[in-house]
């Protein structure tokens, strides 16, 4: 009887050992499968600091929301300002992960900095300068030539900011010297001047005009057909190049999903030009 009990006990112990080994094996396989699945999905995490041109503010907010929804472990933070101001901040020691300017000239300046050593740039969108007039067109400005004799306030960006560079070139081309100009730091500030009635007209982008109209602002506009479209290049800093989250966001900006979001705000795809 004792012998039988010993055999039974040994059998039970052996069965428990095999069962535990089996469970351990399944757990390991499950963990391995989860890791493989995570790697395959390309999931990333971390914070991504983006310096972006002021004209990207509205579109940029939706881009952030869409990317973070697909990548819940990522947090995108923005600084929106004039492109020249963003480059200046980096020159003075700021260290974002990604820079998006509203022209190639300011990106060229950034490319000379150590923070962008060996950086590759990718144009993610294009935009177009337009002359807008305040509601009711108090300055009676219906063409670019009307600015020659206008006494009204005309808002323009600083000349070292992309929207200011384009406006300055266009005015010089048509031999126009503004009699009553107000100079602003970026295109958003110019738009505000016009929408609040503190300027009779201003040079902004078609994207800013579209946003103002969506907000119920009844601005008039004058097309500037001979002004070239300006490009929006994006480039990772050396800091961003070592971040999987920053690299993935930078690549995603050229995806169909991101391009559809940009198109909603009147940006055009670089492939369309």
Tell what function each PLM region has:
Residues 1-11:
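Bacterial N-terminal signal peptides that target proteins for export
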Residues 18-22:
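C-terminal motif of bacterial Sec signal peptides marking the signal peptidase cleavage site
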Residues 24-65, 69, 84, 88, ...:
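Exported/periplasmic ABC-transporter solute-binding proteins
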Residues 73, 95-96, 199:
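Short, high-confidence coil segments that cap the C-terminus of an alpha-helix
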Residues 87, 93, 97-103, 107-113, ...:
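Short beta-strand-centered segments that line the small-molecule binding cleft or hinge
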Residues 128-130:
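Early exported N-terminus immediately downstream of N-terminal targeting peptides
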């Amino acid at each position: 009887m004792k012998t039988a009990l010993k055999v039974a006990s040994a059998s039970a112990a052996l069965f428990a050992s095999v069962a535990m080994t089996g469970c351990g094996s399944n757990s390991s396989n499950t963990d391995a499968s989860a890791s493989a699945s995570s790697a395959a999905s390309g999931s990333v995490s971390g914070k991504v600091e983006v310096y972006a041109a002021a004209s990207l503010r509205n579109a940029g907010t939706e881009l952030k929301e869409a990317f973070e929804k697909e990548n819940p472990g990522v947090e995108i933070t923005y600084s929106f300002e004039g492109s020249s101001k963003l480059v200046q901040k980096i020159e003075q020691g700021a260290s974002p992960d990604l820079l998006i300017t509203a022209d190639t000239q300011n990106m060229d300046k950034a490319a000379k900095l150590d923070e962008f050593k060996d950086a590759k740039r990718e144009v993610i969108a294009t935009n177009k300068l337009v002359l807008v007039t305040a509601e009711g067109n108090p300055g009676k400005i219906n063409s670019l030539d009307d600015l020659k004799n206008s006494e009204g306030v005309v808002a323009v960006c600083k000349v070292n900011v992309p929207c200011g560079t384009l406006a300055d070139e266009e005015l010089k081309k048509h031999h126009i010297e503004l009699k009553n100009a107000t100079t602003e730091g970026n295109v958003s500030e110019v738009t505000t001047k016009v929408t609040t009635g503190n300027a009779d007209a201003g040079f902004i982008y078609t994207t800013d005009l579209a946003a103002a109209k969506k907000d119920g602002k009844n601005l008039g506009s004058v097309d500037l057909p001979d002004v070239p479209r300006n490009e929006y290049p994006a480039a990772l800093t050396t800091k961003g190049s070592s971040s999987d989250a920053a690299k993935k966001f930078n690549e995603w900006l050229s995806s169909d999903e991101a391009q559809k979001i940009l198109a909603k705000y009147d940006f055009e795809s670089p492939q369309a030009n």
